[in-house]
Design a protein with these regions (language model features):
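A C-terminal functional module that forms or caps the active site or interfaces directly
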Residues: 182-202
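RNA substrate-binding interface of SAM-dependent RNA methyltransferases
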Residues: 67-161
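Mobile, glycine- and charge-enriched loop segments
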Residues: 36, 65-77, 176-183
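Short, acidic/turn-prone active-site loops that include or flank metal/cofactor-
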Residues: 63-64, 167-168, 192-193, 215-218
Length: 227
């Protein structure tokens, strides 16, 4: 059964986004009486479609399930990547339950973001996370924050780690296992080529702890899958 996030709710009916209405009509070619899942306020409902040929009516049949139980809440700091790699990271991070994604600019970031295209980028990234949430049956969509410089990142989670290419640091799995009861985790990823030593040291001063992936050097898009 198809799943969509509702824009708003009025009495016993939901209002969907225009893109989702188009998908129902033109892509899925659904008919009156077909059922879909609708997610609203972190709760999933089974709904029935009516008036599909005109202004779709989405009526609640029954409440199905409550919100996700992803714990701890993970904030992922992702360097701005080329479009295809960025899309992959956003999709997989969403599927794996990340709560918040903060795009960052580092010394080795190749893609530049300015005020003129930031809103457009965030809108696109949010859409990708929304579609990944629907596909993976989440009841929440990760929050996409505005792009920040790596120097502006602060350690606000219970556990704050920065992914290092050094073999001398603690293994990430060991650190997470010893903090398995924490409520929030902040993870800073590096771009292709990794973070500079200066950037890592600045994050450590701000409360982050360096971790390693053992003797492996991972592609940047593989990091969320490993953690």
């Amino acid at each position: 059964m198809q799943r969509y996030f509702a824009r708003s709710k009025c009495n016993n009916e939901f209002i969907l986004n225009e893109d989702d209405i188009y998908h129902i009509k033109k892509v899925m070619r659904m008919q009156n009486g077909d059922n879909i899942y609708v997610v609203y306020n972190e709760t999933t409902y089974i709904c029935e479609l009516q008036n599909v040929s005109h202004n779709i009516t989405v009526s609640i049949v029954k409440e199905e399930m409550k919100k996700d139980d992803f714990m701890p809440l993970v904030t992922l700091y992702v360097p701005v990547l080329k479009e295809q790699k960025m899309d992959f990271v956003l999709q997989k991070a969403t599927e794996l339950g990340v709560a918040e994604i903060v795009p960052i600019i580092t010394e080795r970031t190749l893609i530049k973001i300015n005020d003129d295209n930031m809103d457009k980028k965030i809108t696109r990234w949010t859409r990708i996370c929304k579609e990944a949430s629907e596909q993976s049956h989440r009841t929440t969509i990760p929050k996409i924050e505005k792009v920040v410089k790596i120097s502006d990142i602060e350690a606000i989670s219970n556990v704050n780690i920065v992914c290092s290419t050094s073999y001398k640091e603690k293994n990430v799995k060991y650190l997470l296992q010893t903090n398995k009861d924490c409520d929030t985790i902040g993870v800073v990823m590096g771009p292709e080529g990794g973070l500079t030593e200066k950037e890592e040291e600045a994050l450590v001063k701000n409360g982050f702890e360096r971790v390693t992936f053992g003797n492996r050097i991972l592609r940047v898009e593989t990091v969320p899958l490993f953690i």
